Amino acid sequence: MGGVALATGLGSSPAAADPRRGLTTYVLVHGTHSAGAFWMPIARELTLRGHRVVMVDQPRHGAEAFVPESYQRQDLKAMAAELSPLKGLGLEDYEARVTGIVRRAARNGPVVLVGHSLGGVSVSRVGDAVPHLLHHICYMAAFCPSRVLPTADACTAAPENANAVSPVELTVGDPDRLGVLRLNFRTGDSRELALLKEMICADYPDAEFRRVLAGLQTDEPVAAYAGRAVGRAGSWGRLPRTYLRFGRDRTIATALQDRMIAEADAFTPGNSFRVHDFPGASHIGPMDPIPVAEILDTLAA
């Protein structure tokens, strides 16, 4: 979500002399309008438990982020027209970024691939492309497309997502012309801020909500939502997989999470999701990273 933020533990010692060889590496993929740094609290916990962690920045996210000049000035008229270098990026680019990191990490031991939100489509694509390099895959309140709902767009439009809060009314500019869904996270409008908080982290204090907003970026390519991300039974479908289900999610509604889990399990009846329920969690998960990290820790080889 090539810029890659590495947590700790990726050393250069010869493999034969490196006691870390064989440790599990967690490759963490961020969601829409986000960056690898989103994962820092969870990555810190996993590192302290003895794992290696790589927090992926997808192309033009995080360390490569594009910040519109008009966004800095809060000139909304100019912001509606300013061109974006993210236009034209798609799931092929996201898949390539994550696959490259997985290939490197797998040289040193087992890899657990985890995606949040839109990061789920990358998990599905990479899991389908290189299942032999993955020990486990995990979706954290993430899109898991199916043959019936093959894209993030299709998942979002499903009736089970009717309870979700849509950012459409907050969109700046024409997504078809700009090639990106552009949102203004620096808005001072109280109604817009209330909508964003409900969508992202309704259970967080306002101060924490503002911190979350500060880490988000304006642009996400529309092609990423529209790209097909359906795993095949013989590749993606044979990987052990886990779903972290968030019960107060207003971005990917809990009912939609349940449908995606059910459709995946029906597609691979001999290999079902291991589901862990967080009934009070909103879209970005609990404020305390420890409960999530504890579950991820159990996925290690």
Model-derived features with residue positions:
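N-terminal export signals
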Residues: 1-17
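Active-site glycine-rich loops that stabilize anionic/oxyanionic intermediates
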Residues: 31-34, 117-118
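Conserved alpha/beta-hydrolase
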Residues: 47-81
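Conserved acidic catalytic loop of the alpha/beta-hydrolase fold
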Residues: 93-109
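Conserved hydrolase catalytic core segment
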Residues: 110, 114-151
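Flexible "cap/lid" loop of the alpha/beta hydrolase fold
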Residues: 139-181
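Conserved serine/cysteine hydrolase catalytic core
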Residues: 218-270, 274-281
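Catalytic active-site module of serine/aspartate enzymes centered on a nucleophile-bearing elbow/loop
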Residues: 271-301
